[in-house]
């Protein structure tokens, strides 16, 4: 699916904001609230863009990020990391297209997401 975006964020309120922002940028969006569910979904499809929280239940964002980078199906997938942890942001900065420090506004994410469209 060319315009598929995954929002992998366990905070339901923040996830809803991310979903609306991605939809406003023209993506078909799926929200996933759990790292284990994200692992399963990533085996089924390679989205155009992923918004990835680093602190997730069951499987953390760092583990998902390693899996994404190890899979050639994701070579064109853009990654936006979202974290409130400045240390994690620095550690993983080179593994993502963009690292956002929470809190993140609707307009920030919408505008950044729109940059990655075909």
Language-model segments: residues:
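Alpha4 helix (beta4-alpha4-beta5 surface) of REC/receiver domains from two-component response regulators
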Residues: 63, 85-102, 107-111
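Acidic catalytic/metal-coordinating carboxylates
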Residues: 34, 60-63
């Amino acid at each position: 699916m060319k315009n598929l975006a995954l929002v992998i964020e366990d905070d339901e309120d923040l996830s809803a904001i991310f979903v609306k922002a991605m939809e406003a940028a023209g993506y078909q969006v799926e929200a996933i609230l759990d790292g284990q569910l994200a692992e399963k979904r990533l085996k089924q499809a390679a989205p155009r863009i992923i918004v990835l929280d680093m602190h997730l239940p069951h499987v953390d964002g760092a583990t998902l990020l390693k899996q994404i980078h190890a899979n050639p199906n994701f070579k064109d997938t853009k990654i936006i990391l979202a974290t409130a942890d400045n240390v994690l942001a620095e550690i993983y900065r080179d593994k993502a297209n963009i690292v956002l420090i929470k809190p993140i506004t609707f307009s920030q994410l919408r505008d950044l997401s729109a940059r990655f469209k075909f």
